[in-house]
Amino acid sequence: RPAKLEDESARQFNGLRRDSDWVNADITVSTSADQVPVAPGYKVSDTTADGRRTIRYKSDAPIQNFFSVQSARYAVATDRWKDVELAVYHDPAHGYNVERMNTAMKASLDYFTAHFSPFQFRQVRILEFPAYADFAQSFANTIPYSEGIGFIADYRDPEKIDMVTYITAHEVGHQWWGHQVISSDQQGGT
């Protein structure tokens, strides 16, 4: 349970982690040669040798010490919003809602940039993960997203609520609320 607002000592901790704050990420991931490893930051090298693919990602500004690393045999659908690269990494057989996700990312970036502040990253990436859980979560310029709630959801019925757009907008919003502005570990925080 978060500390009460009157507890000034709790202001030294952010709402995500009590043991660390902002870090300069420099992450190297090695995986099978046929997979695409993804981590927060920007790709600075990509090599394949002896059946292994190794990619190094580095942030150009401090990020929260709160991130995920994923690797899979992804297909990648890219798009752009102004000078921001958009990418959806997905199972090649799960392209059903990729265009919907890209459209939602663009609409979210339009809205949040107009109403809050400029977007702080040069890219936004959505990454599919297996439906062992049904959630999406926002990390610095990287949004892991369950196949069950986004990639294989059937939205051909126009009467069905478009949860893919809502969830994508919510997670893009966390690129501001949690990765640009963050509350202390006190009641009322996000």
Stretches found by the model and what they are:
Residues 172-187:
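Catalytic Zn2+-binding segment of zinc metalloproteases
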Residues 1-169:
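Hydrophobic helix-coil surface modules that form long, contiguous segments used
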Residues 101-102, 185-190:
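Active-site metal-coordination segments of metallo-dependent hydrolases
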